[in-house]
């Protein structure tokens, strides 16, 4: 008879412990009802990227001295720099500069080590295309600055949403 009573007591303790754990989980679930939603509706709402975000590379043709430091520090030797040596002034003249963003790993080494700061990272991250050859940007495409998320009137950022203004 005694083992049967201790078995029921053990069962009762386990039941109470399980009910306590379920109650704790339910309290955590209820605490999330007071929070704002984290999900954003992507094409219509966009998150503001951080200051150190590494997006598409912006290239300034006039500042480049064709030193090819960006090619040497790139882990995959990605930037293609075509130049011609001007014999009369003994300087390199940049002819073409291109980066294939289908291959780029966005490590930021080219921007970090560029001696003339002709390369910089932008906040653009939308590269979706149907043809991978469209991801090969030349110096003209790299020179265009993308529209900032904050300046785009068609996009509602998370900070401008009506939920954050009301609450």
Swiss-Prot record:
GO cellular component: chloroplast thylakoid membrane
Keyword Lipid metabolism set for record: no
Single GO MF descriptor: 4 iron, 4 sulfur cluster binding
Entries under InterPro entries matching the protein: 4Fe4S_Fe-S-bd, 4Fe4S_Fe_S_CS, NADH_quinone_OxRdtase_chainI, NDHI
UniProt keyword list: 4Fe-4S, Chloroplast, Iron, Iron-sulfur, Membrane, Metal-binding, NAD, NADP, Plastid, Plastoquinone, Quinone, Repeat, Thylakoid, Translocase
Listed EC numbers: 7.1.1.-
Binding locations of [4Fe-4S] cluster 1: 64, 67, 70, 114
Domain 4Fe-4S ferredoxin-type stretches: 55-84, 95-124
Catalytic activity: a plastoquinone + NADH + (n+1) H(+)(in) = a plastoquinol + NAD(+) + n H(+)(out); a plastoquinone + NADPH + (n+1) H(+)(in) = a plastoquinol + NADP(+) + n H(+)(out)
Membrane topology (UniProt): Peripheral membrane protein
PROSITE patterns for this protein: 4FE4S_FER_1, 4FE4S_FER_2
Co-factor(s): [4Fe-4S] cluster
Localization terms from the record: Plastid, Chloroplast thylakoid membrane
Cofactor details (free text): Binds 2 [4Fe-4S] clusters per subunit.
GO process annotations (BP): photosynthesis, light reaction
Residues reported to bind [4Fe-4S] cluster 2: 74, 104, 107, 110
PANTHER family named among the record's database cross-references: NAD(P)H-QUINONE OXIDOREDUCTASE SUBUNIT I, CHLOROPLASTIC (PTHR47275:SF1)
NCBIfam families (alphabetical): ndhI, NuoI, PRK05888.1-3
Stated family: Belongs to the complex I 23 kDa subunit family.
Physiological role: NDH shuttles electrons from NAD(P)H:plastoquinone, via FMN and iron-sulfur (Fe-S) centers, to quinones in the photosynthetic chain and possibly in a chloroplast respiratory chain. The immediate electron acceptor for the enzyme in this species is believed to be plastoquinone. Couples the redox reaction to proton translocation, and thus conserves the redox energy in a proton gradient.
Description of how the protein assembles with itself and partners: NDH is composed of at least 16 different subunits, 5 of which are encoded in the nucleus.
Protein name: NAD(P)H-quinone oxidoreductase subunit I, chloroplastic
Organism of origin: Draba nemorosa (Woodland whitlowgrass)
């Amino acid at each position: 008879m005694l083992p049967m009573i201790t078995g029921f007591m053990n069962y009762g303790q386990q039941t109470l412990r399980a009910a306590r754990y379920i109650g704790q989980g339910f309290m955590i679930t209820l605490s999330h009802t007071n929070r704002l939603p984290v999900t954003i509706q992507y094409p219509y709402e966009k998150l503001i990227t951080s200051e150190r975000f590494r997006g598409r590379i912006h290239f300034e043709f006039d500042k480049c001295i064709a030193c090819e430091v960006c090619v040497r520090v790139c882990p995959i030797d990605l930037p293609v720099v075509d130049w011609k040596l001007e014999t009369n002034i003994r300087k390199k003249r940049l002819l073409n500069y291109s980066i294939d963003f289908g291959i780029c790993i966005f490590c930021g080494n080219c921007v970090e080590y560029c001696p003339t700061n002709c390369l910089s990272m932008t906040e653009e991250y939308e590269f979706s295309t149907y043809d991978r050859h469209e991801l090969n940007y030349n110096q003209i495409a790299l020179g265009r600055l993308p529209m900032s998320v904050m300046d785009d009137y068609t996009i509602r950022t998370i900070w401008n949403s009506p939920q954050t203004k009301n609450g």
